[in-house]
């Protein structure tokens, strides 16, 4: 293996050197507990608030609407469970989609077991929510709509502003899982009518184990973790100061270079998509062709098993994914690909490649050249492909 090409940035990203540098003093020098009264430690409370300011500015929020959590799944659980509890006297119905991250889907299932009713919306063949279906699903008892900003597997961007407008027209709270979108797309919580938003530091070159929860002023939401008075009595536990500094620094970095960075990612992504679709037969792009995350490409290859494809790519130093990193150990096909209408056998042959700003077109050439050989080799060993080719030849002879 001569080189390593990391193309799984939807799973996690490399922590930026400047982020690590900003964090280091808070492990060994400025290690005080922000809740302590002496100045050595209390200074860290101001540092935490500075990170809140930076993140709030990035999404058009107020500083006191930003809460720090343990990650995206933590924030998603908080949004659903504690909103459901707080508004149970108003209603017991929640609307989400069939293509959400499992942090949402499994939490929704948890709530169903506790008496809440959940509608799981279908999506179209590109993975987009159909707004008419959303409107039709609303009931007098609907208290929350939760739709991800952009899908972690196929990259499709949802009509978030329109969904938020529909929610607010009906007096319903709107939560969005923006774990993949934060740092990749401009977000304004007021323009999009967002009441709650989840994000995770390690998806935009920050550290793992630290997340963000935006909660609009006036939204009633119960405490998720009970104990001390941290995070304005809504999330107990001594603050992860190094992590908070890290996620704040990463957010500032992402905001500063977003336009230039994502323009490059989009150009390289389109180069990848064009080469794969033009040079590898019996292949399809999953997700919307243009309304997709700048760094996301997701393909399905007929007559190829995704796990074998990943192993062969790994042998060439290419890191990719067959779906969400949180479910990659499962032998079941992606619930997202099934939801957009793919048959099981095609969904099983999926490959997600997600870029970063360091990936160049020359790297894509290496990837595609190897991918062509690997797909051809795997198909040679497939009896299904052999039968398909025989039928094609027989049909051509008629």
Q: Can you describe what each PLM-predicted range is?
A:
Residues 1-398:
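Pyridoxal 5′-phosphate
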